[in-house]
Amino acid sequence: MACGAAERGPEPPAFQRHLEASTQRLAHGYGLRSMSELRDQEFGRLAGTVYLDHAGATLFPQSQLTNFTKDLMENVYGNPHSQNITSKLTHDTVEQVRYRILTHFHTTPEDYIVIFTAGSTAALRLVAEAFPWVSRSPENSGSHFCYLTDNHTSVVGMRKVAAAMSVTSIPVKPEDMWSAEGKDAGACDPDCQLPHLFCYPAQSNFSGTRYPLSWVEEVKSGRRSPVNAPGKWFVLLDAASYVSTSPLDLSAHQADFIPISFYKIFGLPTGLGALLVNKHVAPLLRKGYFGGGTAAAYLAGEDFYVPRSSVAERFEDGTISFLDVIALKHGFDALEHLTGGMVNIQQHTFALVQYTHSALSSLRYLNGAPVVRIYSDSEFSSPDVQGPIINFNVLDDGGKIIGYSQVDKMASLYNIHLRTGCFCNLGACQRHLGLSDEMVKKHFQAGHVCGDDVDIIDGRPTGSVRISFGYMSTLEDAQAFLRFISTIYLRSPSDQPVPQASISDAGALTSKSDCHSPQEGSCTDPSVCNGSYPDTNIMDLHPSLSKASSAQQTPQDKAAGILNGDPGSHIVTNIYLYPIKSCAAFEVTKWPVGSQGLLYDRSWMVVNHNGICMSQKQEPRLCLIQPFIDLQQRIMVIKAEGMEPIQVPLEEDGEQTQICQSRVCADRVNTYDCGENVSRWLSKFLGRLCHLIKQSPHFQRNARKTPKKGQPPGTTVALSLVNEAQYLLVNTSSILELQRQLNASDEHGKEESFSMKDLISRFRANIITKGARAFEEEKWDEISIGSLHFQVLGPCHRCQMICINQQTGQRNQDVFQTLSESRGRKVNFGVYLMHSYLDLSSPCFLSVGSEVLPVLKDCGVS
């Protein structure tokens, strides 16, 4: 079954009926042009994708990019600080864009100033640094910086600047602000002009809650005060999230500072924002540093500096990103042409979010328990109180929260793009999830940091799931998401008993599967497998082994004998290495071990034209590229259907290679390019420009996790281009258990059966063992295989790559989904290994048929 073509859950409610039942006059779409036509013409790249992270970044239409590119090709734009003709064109165009921005927000240059910044965060920092704070002193209490706890991290971060100025920072809870009306703090001393700043979002980026724009005037006038402090209140209205889908009228709501981010509105350019400053406030702003273009006059040898009279020029240090500013013109043009304006966008996106909220909140398990818990301060009754955001967590039928990272992984199988975590808004996250300050600190001590996938600690969620709509979102997007939730989560795992694999079942693998036979191209040449090959610069290997080994029973015979013998024994049944990261496996029966793991395992990787590592997540056809290692000839042969084989030397001439830097799982690695010939070969097969690079033999990448036993403190463990650890081990009894689950699912409409060989290949392990019980490997603390000793680092947390059939490159979400359900929503399978210690003074090998001796955690030999 192809990914995304999953069995359909209950059909979402009829959209038209919802529109008719709504108390709001809802509109879907933009007049005569259908949404499907808009998507086809302007967002064709979204075909097959459900993009629901518009609060993170919306998408740009094709016409906007085309017109911007055409503009750049037809005009010459120079530095606006110069005085030539091209510079004059740039200056005038930039000023026209400033005016366009003010018009968009229903105001004029007489009331507001547009200061371009590197984004809304830079705009907030500018306010924090330029605001006329008054420090605390014995004579007065000083200024107050108050911010709603439901604010973006970048707003909360302003308190560090305030603290440096000896200014008191006070977080204000939303409920306290709602009840603050009538606290006339200013009336007690009307002559006090002590400046205070209150910051709040027009729309919560966490839940989509929209706070009253009327607060702007109420706080400024003193009718609603965040705290009881005499003085003059200024208001910063964080509009970055709000203005992406709604009109903002600054003639009616005259906040003092309004930071915005343009990619939230147009999709591009990124890295450009603005601070809109009320002209009445501008003279109060202070500036320390001055950069190019901001000075009317200054002396290099004397402390003499006169700022420019224009407030915008005074605060725009250096040359602004003028081409990005010019791109805004085409953003405004496209938005107006495609939608008719922000009022239409607000109606369209609210219709979608209200419909989705209604359908999502009504989903129930058979026992009546809700499928989701929605975090909101509104009933989604009106766009005045709710934006196009839904924040939630998925529950099981017992009411327990399913971790957001698991939901994210499942969504990716259906090509649904959403956001998880706390969304840079910890205040709202704590409030809605019931997380105390002590809990957050405890979670950090347990290893959880912002942006990771640690979703449940001590049974409590560390974050949630967020979907958000943009102006190009469609009804089909909403319904695809609802079907995904229904399909995946209305089949409760408690309704699906998990059978346990028996010892006899595990021993029957040889008759049910051909997984013990090395595939074509495996290391079968005795001169290779038995170690008869030249030395390499990775490890010192002797040229031959004892000839007596050739007269002994073969590894395959050993494996078969043990499988049919002692049911409690553990043996190695298969060994795989993956010379090229994310490409096909190379199966061997005996293979040398080096300091990084199996020799040449994941020593190469394919990168795109930007030098970014490619994986099967982005390019499933990588699994069809088959590498073969020939240690005698010191070459790697790469094959693929329809392509002539190509050879790559195992080691390049160090004097001829140029070292470049790449990244693997956030680690910096030194690599070198394997040449244009193999680049052309890979590019032709994959249909995109790419290169093959190899880890430099002179660079050591150290593992973040180190063995706890067997090595002195400070010892580092070397890694190749692997993600986590040197080895991955999988137990065939565990695979058999999963196969049974999948076969049981066949009775409920699954369209595909899974062989043991297929399942083994999906998990891309190095070592396959035969064990007595499913998942017993997760109880191991360390193991010995022959003379080699390993520490078990923990389970492998699986991603959507296990959905890819390694023989065809086709996706199927059943494996991931079944594994998630059968293991209590966990997606762990296999365990990571690392050498406890390794003596390379003599050759070391892993062999099929070797006995595995596990030691249980806090116990003894298994």
UniProtKB/Swiss-Prot annotation:
Highest taxon of the source? Eukaryota
SUPFAM superfamilies given for it? MOSC N-terminal domain-like (SSF141673), PK beta-barrel domain-like (SSF50800), PLP-dependent transferases (SSF53383)
Modified sites of kind N6-(pyridoxal phosphate)lysine: 264
According to UniProt, this protein's pathway is:
Cofactor biosynthesis; molybdopterin biosynthesis
> Which residues are responsible for catalysis?
424
Keywords, alphabetical = Molybdenum cofactor biosynthesis, Phosphoprotein, Pyridoxal phosphate, Transferase
Q: What is its EC number?
A: 2.8.1.9
Q: Name one GO biological process term.
A: molybdopterin cofactor metabolic process
Q: What Pfam families does the record tag this protein with?
A: Aminotran_5 (PF00266), MOSC (PF03473), MOSC_N (PF03476)
Phosphoserine modification, residue list:
34, 517
Catalyzed reaction equations? Mo-molybdopterin + L-cysteine + AH2 = thio-Mo-molybdopterin + L-alanine + A + H2O
Q: Which residues form the MOSC domain?
A: 704-855
State the needed cofactors, names only. Answer: pyridoxal 5'-phosphate
Q: Which GO terms describe its molecular function?
A: lyase activity; molybdenum cofactor sulfurtransferase activity; molybdenum ion binding; pyridoxal phosphate binding
Annotated family: Belongs to the class-V pyridoxal-phosphate-dependent aminotransferase family. MOCOS subfamily.
The protein's role, per its UniProt record: Sulfurates the molybdenum cofactor. Sulfation of molybdenum is essential for xanthine dehydrogenase (XDH) and aldehyde oxidase (ADO) enzymes in which molybdenum cofactor is liganded by 1 oxygen and 1 sulfur atom in active form.
What is the name attached to this protein's record? Molybdenum cofactor sulfurase
Which source organism does the UniProt entry give? Mus musculus (Mouse)
